[in-house]
């Protein structure tokens, strides 16, 4: 049997006619979401044919932009299969309710499934209308991370044990088949139309050379998630990291941190140094003294009496706080500019640092509080560097690409925020910045791959950045990962807006103090 006919036979019965108005894919918004590694979310209640096509077009656009067009047909089929199953699961809830059956009761489930397919198809518009009225949705999210494309299909119904078992059985059966023809000859399930489609999906993933564990089924109390984590080309990841390191090595016009600050840094790291020695070194740098006193007298320290003594100021901020101040001042001096774009980037960096500190304080975690500001401040170091060296850096990029025969889409990755993170991390290593700072720069767009010990810190900076984008109208609430909202106990859009506005007001007050 031809593959296209198989797909049509499975899906056409649950598709509504295409609407007259076609939904247009916004390529630039998708490109920006990829750069920021934000999830692209699409929600539908009835999954009409035009929406199914639109979801497929969004997926194809993403795959084109990340240089993997060869998997488009396979993955769009998988997404279509999972969304159809999710919609069908919602329909099933309405059908069972109308029949007075308990879908979680094994006997009722068996009884209802005998007639579900035929009767629901005869009156599908009725059931879809009720689904929408009751708020039963299908949500598709697609998120491009540095290592993978994460696709989730979510419906807000808890899967029953019987449904879970049937899906598991189909997965086990799919392992027995070497191809589609063999599967078609053995699997025909009249009650569960999703069975054959799931087997086809598993065989398609196998054909792509993927392990079956790229597909996961997650059952929560109020929703069911079908998740696919499709690896990006490993070679591309390696090339991106190497290219970023090469760029950092070739930035000749970016000097090391100022020698006086490095001298103070070495003194702090010396276990035999006296506090008076550190104070003496700081006293030789008027600008550093100014920044130190400004810091210790700022609202974040909450002191009732102003401090004007350098020795007392060092005691109050502590050696760790002093180190972070050195990195902040040093980076600012090296990369300072009157250029509007770079000034804007630094202003955004200061804002992110302040928001990260505010979020950290809410957790009460002292280690998190100590590192959050400096990591928030320097998280976009790569973007600042890239802007400062452009267009010279673009010339160097092109030279390196030609020398190493690197594909064009790897260069596109470097030009994106993801590439900026690699460049920033490489530069931070050149400056011998501490590991928390280096890891925050490298992974703030790639939380799943962040080292476990730094995840709370990196999550704080990433959430601070997203909170600012949300407040500025650049990132919708729906695009903020649920894991981050949960970590900071944000339960609604209004709660996030209130938090963001409070942090913004405090930030503005400190700027004018």
Curated annotation (Swiss-Prot):
Gene3D superfamilies documented for this protein: Hypothetical protein af1432
Alphabetical list of PROSITE patterns matching this protein: HDOD
Ranges for domain HDOD: 254-447
Sections of the chain in a coiled coil: none
Pfam families in alphabetical order: HDOD (PF08668)
Record's protein name: Uncharacterized protein TP_0073
Organism field: Treponema pallidum (strain Nichols)
